[in-house]
Each structure stands twice: as C-alpha cells, then as structure tokens.
Amino acid sequence: MYIAIYGKELGIRSGVGIFFSLMSVGLIFSRLIGGKLVDRGQLVKVVSYGTFFCLMGFFALAALNKIKHYNSSMVVGLFYVIALVLGVGYGLIFPAYNTLFVNLAPNNRRATASSTYMTSWDIGVGVGLVLGGRLADARGGLPLAYLVGAFAVAFSLMFFMRIAGPHFERNKLR
C-alpha cells in the first residue's frame, strides 16, 4: 500500500503506525458486523458494501495530496479516517469472498476453493504493488497510483454487482 511513504509525503509526523492500528480497529469492527450479515444470507451485500468502503478509501487517499494544499491540518485527520474506512472495507471483503468461493464448491473441493481464493488474493496484491510502484515512479506519484487503484476497485464493484454476485446467487451450494 505504500502508506508509510505516502504519509511522509503528506507531512504526517504522528507516525503511520497509527494508520495500521486504526485499520485493525476497522477490520475487527467490520468482522463482527459482516459475520452476522453473512449468517443471515447477505453475502452479496457484504461484498458490495466492503468494496464500496475500499472504493471510497482509495479515492480519498488519492485526494489527500490536493487537500493538503488547501488545508494541511485536515489531512492528518482524514488520513486516519481513511484507515478506519479501509479496515472496514477489507474486513468485510476478505472473509466474505472466502465464504463465497467455498459456497460455490462441492464439499470435497472446499479446501481447494479457499486455497484458490487465498492464492488469487496474494497474486493480486503482489501485482498491484508492483504496478502501483511503477506507475507512481513513472507518472504522477502515489496519488495517481491510488486513483488508478480506485478505478480498478470501481470496475470490480460493477463486475461483482452485474456478473459475479448474480452468478453466486444462481449457483451457490449452501
């Protein structure tokens, strides 16, 4: 996520470790709520909500550099609010997608489905970090990388709502 570098670029002196602590709070909070919604059959909504939170978080990260020029004191607060928002988003998405994959697989393939999801997540994070770093170095810095990431999340949300979510509802086994 390059958040430590970006925090320094924004002039945040209070330490970006707070960012990850607040992100953890968001993760824990969202897992409590998301789990109950999934138990009530709201899996597609949980994925959609989580993706929306991530979308807002990435758009806000991209905007922080511009906001800094108008109100630098506001940037620190927003930076930490974004941590909570991203924590909620990731906390909703990660376990919900795993449940989605497992619920599409027959009983004897559930572990394979979960492993496939985890591997896909890892590959996506790795590729995203490399592409984001190259984009930031070559073009417009980290704000551009976060903006491109936000558009990728927007595309994934549309894809999920139009194709993957309905496919899951039609084909789920549990």
Q: For the regions a protein language model found, what residue spans apply to each?
A:
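Short amphipathic helix-loop junctions that connect adjacent transmembrane helices
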Residues: 1-15
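Loop-to-transmembrane helix entry/capping segments in MFS-fold secondary transporters
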Residues: 13-14, 107-117
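Transmembrane alpha-helical segments of major facilitator superfamily
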Residues: 18-27, 121
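Helix-to-loop junctions at the C-terminal end of transmembrane segments
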Residues: 30-43, 136-137
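Structural signature of the two symmetry-related core transmembrane helices
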Residues: 45-60
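Intracellular juxtamembrane helix-capping segments at the cytosolic ends
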Residues: 92-105
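A membrane-interface helix-boundary motif in multi-pass transporters
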Residues: 134-152
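Multi-pass alpha-helical transporter architecture, strongest
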Residues: 149-174
